[in-house]
Amino acid sequence: MASKAKKRAVGNGIQRPLGAPGQREEEEEEEDEVEDEEEDEDDSDEEEDEVDEIVDEEVNIEFEAYSISDNDYGGIKKLLQQLFLKAPVNTAELTNLLMQQNHIGSVIKQTDVSEDSDDEVDEDEIFGFISLLNLTERKGTQCAEQIKELVLSFCEKTCEQSMVEQLDKLLNDTSKPVGLLLSERFINVPPQIALPMHQQLQKELSEARRTNKPCGKCCFYLLISKTFMEAGKSSSRKRQDSLQQGALMFANAEEEFFYEKAILKFSYSVQGESDTRLGGRWSFDDVPMTPLRTVMVIPDDRMNEIMETLKDHLSV
């Protein structure tokens, strides 16, 4: 099924290692013969130097948003695995559900490049996506139940009983549907792209509500955000009440604004599950970071205010 362009997203530079390795100048050998072992060591040192000399350059890449299609299965599933890591969540089923309800949601792809460009572009490669799964409507599906069990289990481990009861009631109140908001992208895609993606999703949700389509009605949004904090600081139960927003860093910078408006929020560590191949290395300026997941619940009536805040900070 061909994807149709939905909305042009923000073009921006992302960091990519480019350029050929630097050439190391060889010193003239004073002796005619060199031991084999010494030659091997020199070769090894040369390879290390070449790796060190690779430089990062900023490449300007234009992105565009497309409606979700069958070709996006692998890319969406990979990004969901980046979010849930080793958690017992059926990401294959979740991906299929998101694709079935393609009246909402978008994927981010690179804008078509000219034929004379030297860049090799995979037209089906996605750099991110946004969508929503109505957990109340999808009650009984394996992935929806697993996600609810996941957040409740970590809430029990890290929060006071009153918050556990509040979250349990919220997730199981069928009269007030809860939507799982999913906004995932690779770590080097700039946050400015989030503004048109979220704006488009809100329009699609409003249209779904007007036409009585799935996902249209949500009273609350559940968001599981990739965050991290300086290693050594705790996200335990005692720490949750005093955990300041400033101590958290958000992989998706715009999700800090959702955090500010959340009526319920807590974090848990995924230190033993992190995969640097997908999410990048969790360190800044050589300061080790502990990868977390931050769960937050935002009422629907606060979403317009969040969208205005995103517009103020992310408009280009």
Swiss-Prot record:
<dbReference type="GO" id="GO:0006974">
    <property type="term" value="P:DNA damage response"/>
</dbReference>
<dbReference type="GO" id="GO:0006281">
    <property type="term" value="P:DNA repair"/>
</dbReference>
<keyword id="KW-0206">Cytoskeleton</keyword>
<dbReference type="GO" id="GO:0000226">
    <property type="term" value="P:microtubule cytoskeleton organization"/>
</dbReference>
<dbReference type="GO" id="GO:0061101">
    <property type="term" value="P:neuroendocrine cell differentiation"/>
</dbReference>
<dbReference type="GO" id="GO:0005814">
    <property type="term" value="C:centriole"/>
</dbReference>
<feature type="region of interest" description="Interaction with BRCA2">
    <location>
        <begin position="61"/>
        <end position="169"/>
    </location>
</feature>
<dbReference type="GO" id="GO:0005654">
    <property type="term" value="C:nucleoplasm"/>
</dbReference>
<dbReference type="GO" id="GO:0005813">
    <property type="term" value="C:centrosome"/>
</dbReference>
<keyword id="KW-0597">Phosphoprotein</keyword>
<keyword id="KW-0131">Cell cycle</keyword>
<comment type="similarity">
    <text>Belongs to the BCP1 family.</text>
</comment>
<protein>
    <recommendedName>
        <fullName>BRCA2 and CDKN1A-interacting protein</fullName>
    </recommendedName>
</protein>
<feature type="region of interest" description="Disordered">
    <location>
        <begin position="1"/>
        <end position="57"/>
    </location>
</feature>
<keyword id="KW-0234">DNA repair</keyword>
<keyword id="KW-0539">Nucleus</keyword>
<feature type="region of interest" description="Interaction with CDKN1A">
    <location>
        <begin position="163"/>
        <end position="261"/>
    </location>
</feature>
<feature type="modified residue" description="Phosphoserine">
    <location>
        <position position="114"/>
    </location>
</feature>
<feature type="modified residue" description="Phosphoserine">
    <location>
        <position position="283"/>
    </location>
</feature>
<dbReference type="GO" id="GO:0005829">
    <property type="term" value="C:cytosol"/>
</dbReference>
<dbReference type="GO" id="GO:0019207">
    <property type="term" value="F:kinase regulator activity"/>
</dbReference>
<feature type="compositionally biased region" description="Acidic residues">
    <location>
        <begin position="25"/>
        <end position="57"/>
    </location>
</feature>
<dbReference type="GO" id="GO:0097431">
    <property type="term" value="C:mitotic spindle pole"/>
</dbReference>
<keyword id="KW-0227">DNA damage</keyword>
<feature type="modified residue" description="Phosphoserine">
    <location>
        <position position="44"/>
    </location>
</feature>
<dbReference type="InterPro" id="IPR025602">
    <property type="entry name" value="BCP1_family"/>
</dbReference>
<dbReference type="Pfam" id="PF13862">
    <property type="entry name" value="BCCIP"/>
</dbReference>
<dbReference type="GO" id="GO:0090307">
    <property type="term" value="P:mitotic spindle assembly"/>
</dbReference>
<keyword id="KW-0963">Cytoplasm</keyword>
<dbReference type="GO" id="GO:0007052">
    <property type="term" value="P:mitotic spindle organization"/>
</dbReference>
<dbReference type="GO" id="GO:0034453">
    <property type="term" value="P:microtubule anchoring"/>
</dbReference>
<dbReference type="GO" id="GO:0019908">
    <property type="term" value="C:nuclear cyclin-dependent protein kinase holoenzyme complex"/>
</dbReference>
<comment type="subunit">
    <text>Interacts with BRCA2, CDKN1A and MTDH/LYRIC. Interacts with DCTN1/p150-glued and ACTR1A/ARP1. Interacts with alpha-, beta- and gamma-tubulins. Interacts with TENT5C; the interaction has no effect on TENT5C poly(A) polymerase function.</text>
</comment>
<comment type="function">
    <text>During interphase, required for microtubule organizing and anchoring activities. During mitosis, required for the organization and stabilization of the spindle pole. May promote cell cycle arrest by enhancing the inhibition of CDK2 activity by CDKN1A. May be required for repair of DNA damage by homologous recombination in conjunction with BRCA2. May not be involved in non-homologous end joining (NHEJ).</text>
</comment>
